[in-house]
Swiss-Prot record:
Signal sequence segment: none
Stated name of the protein: Phallacidin proprotein
Keywords, comma-separated and alphabetical: Thioether bond, Toxin
Covalent cross-link site, Cyclopeptide (Ala-Pro): A2-P8
Keyword Membrane among UniProt keywords: no
Source taxon at top rank: Eukaryota
Function: Major toxin that belongs to the bicyclic heptapeptides called phallotoxins. Although structurally related to amatoxins, phallotoxins have a different mode of action, which is the stabilization of F-actin. Phallotoxins are poisonous when administered parenterally, but not orally because of poor absorption.
Propeptide: 1, 9-23
Keyword check for tRNA-binding: no
Chain positions of cross-link 2'-cysteinyl-6'-hydroxytryptophan sulfoxide (Trp-Cys): W3-C7
GO molecular function, one term: toxin activity
PTM remark: Processed by the macrocyclase-peptidase enzyme POPB to yield a toxic cyclic heptapeptide. POPB first removes 10 residues from the N-terminus. Conformational trapping of the remaining peptide forces the enzyme to release this intermediate rather than proceed to macrocyclization. The enzyme rebinds the remaining peptide in a different conformation and catalyzes macrocyclization of the N-terminal 7 residues.
Sequence similarity: Belongs to the MSDIN fungal toxin family.
Amino acid sequence: PAWLVDCPCVGDDISRLLTRGEK
């Protein structure tokens, strides 16, 4: 999503959550 690209720091955290299968 664009909002992830807009905030790399948050996107990195989201990536970790995605890897864990959180959200």
